[in-house]
Amino acid sequence: MTKLTFGALVALAMTAAASTAMSSKAMAQDAAAGKTSFNKCLACHAIGEGAKNKVGPELNGLNGRKSGTAPDYSYSDANKNSGITWDEATFKEYIKDPKAKIPGTKMAFAGIKNETEINNLWTFVSQFDKDGKIKQ
């Protein structure tokens, strides 16, 4: 009985370790797919070290940032007064239909409807801190 219990614990630990490794690999794949999706955003936005505002604001440190507060970017009153603090749920709702989430936004983008693509894009964007470095 003791051997069976010990064996079960070892098997459980190995399963948990494999699951964690697969989860990390899946997240890396999601970020890579999100980077590809971000190509749709590059005409207006920048992210990463040295990113600057373009037609749209740079997106470093988006997770936890209040809407309308990227330095040196001229936001619409709608964005400045939206009361939004960016997080995963808010971003996903916004990116599906920006003008529905923030009526009056200057963002001229029809949105992304594919849930997997939205998830991947969030994984990519949210990995950058306010200085454009990838969080560890």
Swiss-Prot record:
Keyword Metal-binding in the entry? The reply is: yes
Keywords, ordered alphabetically: Electron transport, Heme, Iron, Metal-binding, Periplasm, Signal, Transport
Q: What is this protein called?
A: Cytochrome c-550
Primary gene name: cycA
Name the positions where heme c binds: C41, C44, H45, M107
The listed locations are: Periplasm
Instruction: Tell me how the protein is altered or processed after translation.
Output: Binds 1 heme c group covalently per subunit.
Q: Which GO terms describe its cellular component?
A: periplasmic space
Cystine bridges: which residues?
Answer: none
